[in-house]
Amino acid sequence: MEKFSTHTGIGVPLRQSNVDTDQIIPAVYLKRITRTGFEDALFAAWRKDPAFILNQEPFNAGSVLVAGPDFGTGSSREHAVWALKDFGFKTVLSSRFADIFRGNSGKQGLLAAEVAQDDIELIWKVLENAPGTEVTVDLVSKTVMCGNVVAPFEIDDYTRWRLLEGLDDIGLTLQHEEDITAYEATRPAFKPKTLPARLS
């Protein structure tokens, strides 16, 4: 997972509240076994409408999604995060996230930044009045900047640390690789053990 400290990209104002994971990526796409290639599935039902914001330039090149409250509700789907990332989003701003979506995002390297709704409204106005305006999200200072709007955002310390260090679950485990190897070396031979992957 890549480290995340600061990102600047085109902001996409999504004036929708209660966006659930089935709207983010419909269930029909969950049959795939890979973790990539989901960009076409993102908001698939809504993108059938030519007027949908992600079908419009310059928003189709956006990397900062500015959504309404209660983003990512519904069932737990890592695919929702994968679809957002595959489309090109690095961060989602909302005044409230579903806990499961927030957790999945942090584990996959997508920043879910909780911004006060009043500030979201101000950012929406900037982005709608000047399409293509870039939004800077600074994880170090926990600040969002868009036009003349400067707003703080909330994120729990543990997820912030993981993003800054670029640590997914595997990365966290590998921090203890020496201890794991030492433990495995002392285990009786008759017990099961994990073998190294074979590259072919």
Swiss-Prot record:
Between which residues do disulfide bridges form?
Answer: none
Listed A to Z, the keywords are: Amino-acid biosynthesis, Branched-chain amino acid biosynthesis, Leucine biosynthesis, Lyase
Question: So, what pathway does this thing act in?
Answer: Amino-acid biosynthesis; L-leucine biosynthesis; L-leucine from 3-methyl-2-oxobutanoate: step 2/4
Catalysis performed (reactions): (2R,3S)-3-isopropylmalate = (2S)-2-isopropylmalate
- Look up the domain of life of the source: Bacteria
What does the entry give for GO biological process? L-leucine biosynthetic process
Which parts form a coiled-coil structure per UniProt? none
Q: Which Pfam families match?
A: Aconitase_C
List its EC numbers.
Answer: 4.2.1.33
Q: Give the CC-aspect GO terms.
A: 3-isopropylmalate dehydratase complex
What InterPro entries does this protein map onto? Answer: 3-IsopropMal_deHydase_ssu, Aconitase/3IPM_dehydase_swvl, AconitaseA/IPMdHydase_ssu_swvl, IPMI_Swivel, LeuD
Q: GO molecular function: any one?
A: 3-isopropylmalate dehydratase activity
PANTHER family the UniProt entry points to? 3-ISOPROPYLMALATE DEHYDRATASE SMALL SUBUNIT, 3-ISOPROPYLMALATE DEHYDRATASE SMALL SUBUNIT 2-RELATED-RELATED
Query: Family assignment?
Result: Belongs to the LeuD family. LeuD type 1 subfamily.
Matching HAMAP family: LeuD_type1
Physiological role: Catalyzes the isomerization between 2-isopropylmalate and 3-isopropylmalate, via the formation of 2-isopropylmaleate.
Its quaternary organisation is:
Heterodimer of LeuC and LeuD.
The name under which this protein is listed is 3-isopropylmalate dehydratase small subunit
State the organism of origin: Arthrobacter sp. (strain FB24)
Lineage, broadest ranks: Bacteria, Bacillati, Actinomycetota, Actinomycetes, Micrococcales
Tell me what gene encodes this: leuD
